């Protein structure tokens, strides 16, 4: 199975502080997603060396209350290094790793793994960009982004599967 990854953070650079990490297993040529998923709220104190951008804090202030509450809720937060270990176990079991855009989620995760001197749990050639696929179908209906990492993973999976069906894709390499 493939894996869709999404995270929410406090900036756009590779060293940004991570609020939440989500990963959802799925078949890109199927419908819906599998039961295997990962979701974690990350402890901010475990990320003191990571950056925070004021413009992103300001942006979060404009988001719906539900998105802010999920991203900043203090309940059940775990240290970043623990989340990376848990996420890595799921990533290694996946055929391809998808994220929306080539420069945000995976760059931040790569920086995080390297900052803890942890090996990357993926090979460079398995990373895929869902946004590029969406661009092949300009009329693709795009539901709004919730900025809840797991909900966004699932929305991106739905859009990816819909686009691949629309394009009559029968096989992925």
What are these regions (language model features)?
Residues 121-142:
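Short, flexible loop segments at boundaries between secondary-structure elements
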Residues 37-42, 121-124, 172-173:
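Short alpha-helical "patches" and their helix-cap loops
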Residues 88-91, 103-124:
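Substrate-recognition/cap helix-loop segment adjacent to the acidic, metal-dependent catalytic center
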Residues 96-102, 107-108, 112, 138-173:
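Acidic, Mg2+-coordinating catalytic module of metal-dependent nucleases/exonucleases
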Residues 72-75, 125, 145-148:
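Pocket-edge positions in alpha/beta enzyme catalytic cores
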Residues 6-8, 105, 129, 152:
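Acidic active-site catalytic centers that drive phospho-/nucleotidyl reactions
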Residues 3, 8-99:
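Conserved non-catalytic scaffold segment of RNase H-like nuclease domains
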């Amino acid at each position: 199975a493939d894996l869709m990854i999404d995270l929410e953070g406090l900036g756009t650079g590779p060293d940004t502080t991570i609020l939440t990490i989500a990963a959802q297993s799925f078949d890109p040529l199927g419908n819906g997603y599998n039961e295997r998923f990962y979701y974690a709220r990350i402890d901010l104190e475990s990320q003191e060396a990571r950056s925070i951008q004021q413009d992103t804090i300001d942006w979060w202030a404009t988001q719906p209350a539900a998105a802010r509450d999920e991203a900043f809720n203090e309940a059940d937060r775990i240290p970043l290094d623990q989340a990376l270990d848990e996420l890595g176990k799921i990533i290694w079991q996946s055929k391809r790793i998808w994220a929306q855009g080539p420069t945000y989620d995976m760059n931040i995760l790569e920086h995080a793994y390297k900052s803890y001197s942890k090996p990357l749990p993926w090979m460079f050639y398995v990373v895929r960009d869902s946004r590029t696929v969406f661009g092949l179908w300009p009329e693709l209906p795009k539901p709004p982004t919730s900025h809840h990492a797991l909900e966004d993973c699932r929305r991106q999976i739905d859009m990816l599967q819909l686009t691949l069906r629309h394009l009559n894709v029968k096989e992925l390499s």
